[in-house]
Amino acid sequence: MTVLPDDGLSLAAEFPDATHEQWHRLVEGVVRKSGKDVSGTAAEEALSTTLEDGLTTRPLYTARDAAPDAGFPGFAPFVRGSVPEGNTPGGWDVRQRYASADPARTNEAVLTDLENGVTSLWLTLGSAGLPVTGLERALDGVYLDLVPVALDAGSEAATAARELLRLYEAAGVADDAVRGTLGADPLGHEARTGEKSTSFAAVAELARLCGERYPGLRALTVDALPYHEAGASAAQELGASLATGVEYLRALHDKGLGVEKAFAQLEFRFAATADQFLTIAKLRAARRLWARVAEVSGVPAAGAQRQHAVTSPVMMTRRDPWVNMLRTTVACLGAGVGGADAVTVLPFDHELGLPDAFARRIARNTSTILLEESHLARVIDPAGGSWYVERLTDELAHAAWDFFKEIERADGQVAALRSGLVGDRIAATWAERRKKLARRREPITGVSEFPLLTERPVEREPAPAAPPGGLPRVRRDEAYEELRGRSDAHLEATGARPKVFIAALGPAAAHTARATFAANLFMAGGVEPVHDPVSVDAETAAEAFAASGATVACLCSSDVLYAEQAEAVARALKSAGALRVFLAGRGEFADIDEYVFAGCDAVAVLTSTLDRMGVA
């Protein structure tokens, strides 16, 4: 085969080279068409997106944005993967989660899932899941020499570990065939529940036992989900997990375990969100950070971090939960491309209670489709070489390292957690994010955008309650969920939802965009829009409003028609009994009580509206 020169392989070889200056001029022209007078770098900034942690995503990345060399897969700093072959041999480990307190029900689900694509089991034990005494029944019929098991037992970690090891021995499983993690995570449990960890002795003993007898079994899990579920940014999640990992290394070393052996006993668990590029960068940055810890510990070859990625519970919604299938698909893709060793796709009904068989099937099939039909695991580190991904990985790693150093200056994760430093930093991040959610700057499809008021509620059996205390647990949809709950209660009590009359002025071309915007905004709070007749004026508005059954109204039209008719129509609506008259857009008009527009505080508007309507 003839090898072509480089220019023969380049699709752009016959085109003249473009420069940043040329691109900036073209961008200026586009941005100016939107009414903004910008030039130079300001045009690029207008198209940039500010992320949490002080990071910025720009619209264009080129070779001059190249990050430091990420090395090769399987070699320090392990950015491109913990092993040279990545997930190519068989794809990532498809790990399903089980949290039912019923051993028989858990066993039925486990066997069904293992027969249909699941490759390992993640069992939640103790007060938040399955009783430790039910572990044997739950694993009845499971070939323990073939199926890795990951435990998550909180304060009962040592007891659960001993029970699992007893089951391995009873089943005659060879020591070198035992695989999985015992899941001891005293600091993660403290972060989640507030229960202080007084001793690492039991954990160290488990680590020593695994190191000496079970080479495929890890004793500890560094679970970053408690921080993510409290509202942490990606860098805070990474920084807290890094600090926790370092605490465990110190504790194990103090108990006599060698540094290299201590590294081999840790598995890390991270959240994967629907922000696919941030998820990819987060997992790559996590490996780089852990490799740095191994390097300064004098064992650089031990820094290959084992990762378990879980689709984010924070992003899941209770309303229109079917959309969660789309969110978890993107999150799973990000986790796989990011190089996670094991991936758990939470069922779409996760936030509603215990998943049913259909939800579990969709969850496991998400990985199957991405692996078997989309062939995501056929390429090692497919995001590697992307200037954007490499730069985002580098910037995120630096931001996480800064947070890690702040924790270390506070005497480590134990002290920082108990002093409130970690919780305070995360709370501040979540407060800013809540503002974006309230203003719909971070849209939630099916909740704050395009809600479906006529949806039938999805009901599930309640999951075991998580222990109280510790860091708070947040959800993106919580403010809108509260508003929708008030609307539901009103519907049950009166037979109708609170209503808003959409007073559309002029032809469809003039009012459709703002009428659609207003309808979606009010539905996000459970307020039903009434848009009949299609168009009104000052003479017909009062009669139409009275017939609508609504108690508030919202004018929707063009700026030109607002100038001509808004004040007269608003007076007519108030004369007909409207408690409040809104206008979709901005301006200063008599008899208009409030303006709704892109970026307004939708939660505040909807809360005050329901209050005035007497909706409890």
From Swiss-Prot:
SUPFAM superfamilies: Cobalamin (vitamin B12)-dependent enzymes (SSF51703)
NCBIfam families: mmCoA_mut_beta
InterPro entries given in the database record: Cbl-dep_enz_cat, Me-malonyl-CoA_mutase_sm_su_N, MeMalonylCoA_mutase_a/b_cat, MMCoA_mutase_b
Biological or metabolic pathway of the protein: Metabolic intermediate metabolism; propanoyl-CoA degradation; succinyl-CoA from propanoyl-CoA: step 3/3
PANTHER family per record: METHYLMALONYL-COA MUTASE, MITOCHONDRIAL, METHYLMALONYL-COA MUTASE, MITOCHONDRIAL-RELATED
Assigned protein family: Belongs to the methylmalonyl-CoA mutase family.
Enzyme Commission no: 5.4.99.2
Catalytic reaction annotation: (R)-methylmalonyl-CoA = succinyl-CoA
Role description: Catalyzes the isomerization of succinyl-CoA to methylmalonyl-CoA during synthesis of propionate from tricarboxylic acid-cycle intermediates. This conversion most likely represents an important source of building blocks for polyketide antibiotic biosynthesis. It is unable to catalyze the conversion of isobutyryl-CoA into N-butyryl-CoA.
GO cellular component: cytoplasm
Keywords from the UniProt entry: Cobalamin, Cobalt, Isomerase
Cofactor(s) it depends on: adenosylcob(III)alamin
Protein name: Methylmalonyl-CoA mutase small subunit
GO molecular function annotation: cobalamin binding; methylmalonyl-CoA mutase activity
Gene3D superfamilies (UniProt xref): 1.10.196.20, Cobalamin-binding domain, Methylmalonyl-CoA mutase
GO terms under biological process: lactate fermentation to propionate and acetate; propionate metabolic process, methylmalonyl pathway
Subunit structure: Heterodimer of an alpha and a beta chain.
Upper lineage: Bacteria, Bacillati, Actinomycetota, Actinomycetes, Kitasatosporales
